[in-house]
């Protein structure tokens, strides 16, 4: 038996209970971050912002938030502020610590699992903001509620201070500031303004009546900073107009729009036909872009085809149609069966 084979055999024999690792708290997120945020490149870096913003959007969908501010700070940290109810800070009996610390340090913790707190949620798995905490060298949570300002700081998922009352206030809301960990995001920790702007613009169209503001405090070469404000009064109708602006001429000026609910599930559809050669379909579930489609998109396509077919039959349109296919083939080989 070779030396290499002997080493392999020894390793197999040495495999025991001592080799089984139990990762506590948010260690699993830091150990395998891509399992939670997709990757640790540029896409994953920006996904951290989306996770925090999604919490604010969920507050808006529940009817408690109207304004969301996202700021890229000079040191490439991110601050997300909303005027929602504010994350609870009272004592959590089961976990033995404040509800704020539970939300920020325990996976699968949050109000999304309580039907009375959120009817619709884009972060049902409840790992979002705790993952952001785990993958940041610094996270500061500031909560405005019950007339007080609560604050707690963290590093790499672990609290570095207790929940403290640092002032008084007359408003409500949550402010999360975090700085991504360069040990995790080795490719880049620099945020791109346009990537965040595109996502916030999309969210504004998907959630009409909500203001999303983006600020970049990093001065450019001329010393200027940038900001954009996204707000949509008509929602999906405006989204279709925006998407169709560079895709040819509309065949029908009026946008086809449907907003209804069935079996407790709200459905909203906006569409417009134009003279371009390819379709442009975007489907979403709870504000999340389902780029691979799904039963919701398949069902929509079938329903649309069925509706158009029925209209054509009922109106007698099919009887008037004539179809002719003319094919000229100069090459004899094109006439073979293969």
List the model feature ranges, each with a label.
Residues 1-53, 102:
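Bergerat-fold GHKL ATPase/HATPase_c domain
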Residues 2-19, 76-99, 110-233, 239-242:
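GHKL-type ATPase core
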Residues 22-30, 73-74, 167-177, 271-285:
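Flexible hinge/switch segments at interdomain interfaces of large molecular machines
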Residues 43-64, 133:
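Conserved ATP-binding N-box helix of the HATPase_c
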Residues 46-54, 97-113, 197, 240-248, ...:
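A short, contiguous, amphipathic alpha-helix enriched in charged residues
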Residues 59-63, 122, 335:
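Conserved ATP-binding/catalytic signature of the HATPase_c
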Residues 66-71:
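A conserved short beta-strand within the histidine kinase catalytic ATPase domain
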Residues 327-336:
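Conserved small/polar residues in nucleotide/adenosyl-binding loops
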């Amino acid at each position: 038996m070779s030396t290499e084979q002997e080493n392999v055999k020894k390793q197999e024999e040495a495999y025991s209970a001592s080799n089984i690792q139990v990762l506590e708290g948010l260690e699993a997120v830091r150990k395998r971050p891509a399992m939670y945020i997709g990757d640790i490149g540029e896409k994953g870096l920006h996904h951290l912002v989306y996770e925090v913003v999604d919490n604010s959007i969920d507050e808006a969908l529940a009817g408690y938030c109207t304004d969301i501010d996202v700021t890229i700070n000079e040191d490439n940290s991110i601050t997300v502020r909303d005027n929602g109810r504010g994350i609870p800070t009272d004592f959590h009996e089961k976990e033995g610590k404040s509800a704020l610390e539970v939300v920020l340090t325990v996976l699968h913790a949050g109000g999304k699992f309580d039907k009375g707190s959120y009817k619709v949620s884009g972060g049902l798995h409840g790992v979002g903001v705790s993952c952001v905490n785990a993958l940041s060298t610094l996270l500061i949570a500031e909560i405005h509620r019950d007339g007080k300002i609560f604050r707690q700081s963290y590093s790499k998922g672990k609290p570095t201070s207790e929940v403290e009352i640092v002032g008084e206030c007359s408003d409500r809301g949550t402010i999360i500031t975090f700085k991504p960990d360069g040990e995790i995001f080795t490719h880049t920790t620099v945020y791109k303004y346009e990537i965040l702007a595109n996502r916030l613009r999309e969210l504004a169209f998907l959630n009409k009546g909500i203001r999303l503001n983006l600020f970049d405090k990093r001065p450019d070469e001329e010393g200027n900073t940038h900001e954009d404000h996204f707000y949509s009064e008509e929602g999906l109708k405006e989204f279709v107009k925006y998407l169709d602006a560079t895709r040819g001429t509309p065949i029908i000026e009026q946008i086809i729009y449907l907003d209804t609910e069935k079996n407790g599930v709200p459905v909203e559809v906006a569409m417009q036909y134009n003279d371009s050669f390819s379709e442009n379909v975007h489907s979403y579930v709870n504000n999340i872009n389902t780029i691979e489609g799904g039963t919701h998109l398949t069902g929509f396509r079938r329903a649309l085809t069925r509706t158009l077919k029925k209209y054509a039959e009922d109106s007698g349109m099919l009887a008037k149609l004539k179809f002719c296919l003319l094919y000229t083939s100069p090459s004899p080989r094109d006439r073979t069966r293969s």
